[in-house]
A protein has these predicted regions:
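Short gly/ser-rich loop at a beta-strand->alpha-helix junction or flexible surface loop bordering the NTP-binding
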Residues: 1-125, 246-248
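Surface segments flanking catalytic/ligand-binding clefts of nucleic-acid enzymes
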Residues: 96-248
Length: 248
């Protein structure tokens, strides 16, 4: 790519509606990137950047040039924490549910994210991006699920399975957010939508299915994720311990 001006960094982060926390993402100003063969964009309300770009790192949305999802993930690495970069990576790697979404393929593969890192080895924040890719997993449906998984693993708990179907009694299949099938422990993160009346009924039925099949269902909310998810870790750890798991 030789001549262009494209929305990038925090602006592209918002355009792509990425999950995760990017410091300053809502600050005034539009981030514009150009190839390093051009002068940096300098005008009121514009935050200019220059860099090396490959043809497949720029796309067009409603007539506006914007850095691709994978390139945007890398460009934001300098300001984001490793865990929040992992949140975005999980989002990009997630396999969609065709019955509920307008796509059938993930936004990126692990190989595509790795290739992006290999292309731009001197990019600020690339070390954090590499660590984020190492701890990214396919299967998380939301940012809280990723943060919960990371907190559990960091606390020394076994790594859970992500959104894997569990066959319960009478052939009923449930797909918990996180699971320890070996110990018959399921973990669900319940966001604000779980307070709605219809969802409460579904949640009760779900819990009955798990308990009837001998599983423990651990229900986690935003409150449990405070203070580095200590309460969430304690709940899951207690459930695993009751099934014979012991920390190393």
């Amino acid at each position: 790519v030789t001549q262009f001006s494209a929305a990038s960094h925090a602006t592209a982060f918002l355009i792509w509606d990425f999950p995760g926390f990017l410091p300053g993402s809502h600050s005034p100003g539009i981030h514009i990137s150009r190839p390093d063969t051009m002068a940096i964009a300098r005008r009121r309300g514009v935050i200019g950047h220059v860099g090396q770009f490959f043809d497949d790192e720029i796309t067009r949305i409603d007539g506006v040039l914007v850095t691709t999802r994978t390139r945007t993930w890398l460009d934001c690495a300098r300001k984001m924490s490793i865990d929040e970069l992992t949140v975005v990576a999980d989002h990009l790697l997630r396999h969609p549910r065709p019955a509920f979404e307008s796509r059938t393929e993930p936004y990126a593969s692990p190989a595509q994210l790795a290739e992006m890192l290999d292309r731009h080895k001197g990019t600020p924040g690339i070390r954090k991006a590499r660590l984020a890719l190492e701890q990214a997993r396919i299967g998380a449906d939301s940012a809280p699920e990723t943060r919960l998984r990371l907190a559990l693993c960091r606390a020394g708990l076994p790594e859970p399975e992500l959104n894997v179907g569990a066959v319960l009694r009478n052939g009923v299949v449930r797909q918990p957010d996180l699971a320890y099938s070996e110990h018959q422990v399921a973990v669900e993160y319940e966001g604000a939508g779980h307070s709605e009346a219809a969802q409460v009924i579904r949640d009760i039925a779900r819990e009955e299915d798990f308990s009837g099949a001998g599983w423990i269902l651990v229900r986690i909310s935003k409150r449990h994720m405070e203070n580095d998810a200590r309460a969430a870790v304690a709940k899951v750890s207690a459930a695993l311990a009751s099934r014979g798991w012991q920390p190393n």
